[in-house]
């Protein structure tokens, strides 16, 4: 199973034991790496330095992040429509979550996260795994 990791799983170690049995390929989008990179600008120099080290390790583990292309932009538009129809706003912090979801959907992959509520309403299009 192809599984995209949400940013929060790079911040805190995933609970791999919660995964369904089988072999899995773990992927990260460039958007997740971008969101994770916010920590490298932390005002505390020790936290920023650790974030830089962690980013290098994650890039080494997961490779280049999958891109957000026109295809994913079209999927994002559909996700915005779903969210709006449900009475929620697709903007703000939710924007990046929807873009991360669009990359996973475009790749035909599941999305693993700690914060399933960030992706409420997308389940018809996206298999979400709580870790």
What kind of region is each of these model predictions?
Residues 3, 13-102, 120-130:
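PIN-domain endoribonuclease scaffold, especially VapC-family toxins
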Residues 114:
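Conserved acidic donor-binding loop of glycosyltransferase catalytic domains
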Residues 117:
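Flexible glycine-rich beta->alpha loop in the catalytic core of nucleotide-sugar glycosyltransferases
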Residues 105:
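Anion (oxyanion) recognition and catalysis
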């Amino acid at each position: 199973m192809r599984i995209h990791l949400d940013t929060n799983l790079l911040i805190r170690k995933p609970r791999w034991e919660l995964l369904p049995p089988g072999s899995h390929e773990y992927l990260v989008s460039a958007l997740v790496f971008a969101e994770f990179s916010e920590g490298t600008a932390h005002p505390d120099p020790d936290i920023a330095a650790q974030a830089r080290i962690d980013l290098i390790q994650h890039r080494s583990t997961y490779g280049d992040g999958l891109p957000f292309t026109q295809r994913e932009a079209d999927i994002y538009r559909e996700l915005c429509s779903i969210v709006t129809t449900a009475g929620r706003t697709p903007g703000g912090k939710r924007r990046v979550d929807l873009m991360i979801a669009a990359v996973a959907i475009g790749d035909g992959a599941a999305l693993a996260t700690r914060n399933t509520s960030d992706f409420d309403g997308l389940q018809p299009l996206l298999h979400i795994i709580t870790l």
